[in-house]
């Protein structure tokens, strides 16, 4: 399975002036933990890091020598453009792809493997977790409009997996139509294509704020403590 890791993370909400994926996490850059999980996953055979040129040297230096094919792909101005460039950078003949946020550094190798197996069996899917809070839909004034049924709500995460050519066609269509979506599954929804969820468990968080970084440190410490 081919894996694209989105690595153009901003440090703005972390209060940092650099890519948050380069922030230290238990003595290593955050992205190193993400890549470690991909390297350990038995179903992942190729890794593409999609990022900005300003971060290239530092990210690749942080990863060091790895035992799987790993390439750098220059990202675009938006996530959508970066994914399209990532697809263009896949090896010739690649049929399926997983796309993962570099900031989800708590991902477990098993999650990559489960997603890969399901995608290769024909599914378009996203890792997700059932929503446990009661969700309120509000209007522009902050007044509650209604309460969606929590049993139907899942929080979308990554990896997200698709057939390469179908995903490429979707992004080309989005580019032509001027659509803006927050993830690849939203693009499939807009085109009427089916996507299923795969339960990622509770710990597959995206590190976005300083609090998230504290949580990630605690989780990783618990995993590495004998």
Swiss-Prot record:
Domain of life: Bacteria
Residues under site feature: Transition state stabilizer: 13, 20
MF GO annotations: 2-C-methyl-D-erythritol 4-phosphate cytidylyltransferase activity
Gene that encodes the chain: ispD
Organism of provenance: Synechococcus sp. (strain CC9902)
Pfam families in the cross-refs: IspD
GO biological process entries: isopentenyl diphosphate biosynthetic process, methylerythritol 4-phosphate pathway
Family: Belongs to the IspD/TarI cytidylyltransferase family. IspD subfamily.
Associated pathway: Isoprenoid biosynthesis; isopentenyl diphosphate biosynthesis via DXP pathway; isopentenyl diphosphate from 1-deoxy-D-xylulose 5-phosphate: step 2/6
The protein, known as: 2-C-methyl-D-erythritol 4-phosphate cytidylyltransferase
The reaction(s) this protein catalyses: 2-C-methyl-D-erythritol 4-phosphate + CTP + H(+) = 4-CDP-2-C-methyl-D-erythritol + diphosphate
């Amino acid at each position: 399975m081919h894996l694209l890791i989105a690595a153009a993370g901003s440090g703005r909400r972390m209060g940092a002036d650099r890519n948050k994926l380069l922030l230290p996490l238990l003595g290593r850059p955050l992205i190193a933990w993400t890549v470690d999980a991909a390297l350990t996953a038995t179903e992942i055979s190729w890794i593409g890091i999609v990022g900005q040129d300003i971060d290239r040297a530092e990210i690749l230096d942080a990863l060091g020598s790895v035992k799987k094919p790993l390439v750098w792909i220059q990202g675009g101005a938006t996530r959508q453009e970066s994914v399209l460039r990532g697809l263009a950078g896949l090896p010739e003949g690649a049929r399926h792809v997983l796309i993962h946020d570099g900031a989800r550094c708590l991902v477990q190798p098993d999650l990559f493997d489960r997603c890969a197996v399901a995608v290769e069996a024909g599914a378009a899917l996203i890792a997700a977790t059932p929503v446990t809070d009661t969700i309120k839909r509000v209007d522009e004034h902050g007044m509650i409009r209604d309460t969606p049924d929590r049993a139907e709500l899942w929080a979308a995460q990554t990896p997200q997996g698709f057939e390469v050519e179908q995903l490429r066609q979707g992004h080309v269509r989005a580019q032509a139509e001027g659509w803006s979506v927050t993830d690849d599954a939203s693009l499939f929804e807009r085109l009427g294509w089916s996507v299923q969820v795969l339960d990622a468990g509770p710990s597959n968080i995206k590190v976005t704020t300083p609090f998230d970084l504290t949580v990630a440190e605690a989780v990783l410490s618990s995993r590495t403590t004998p």
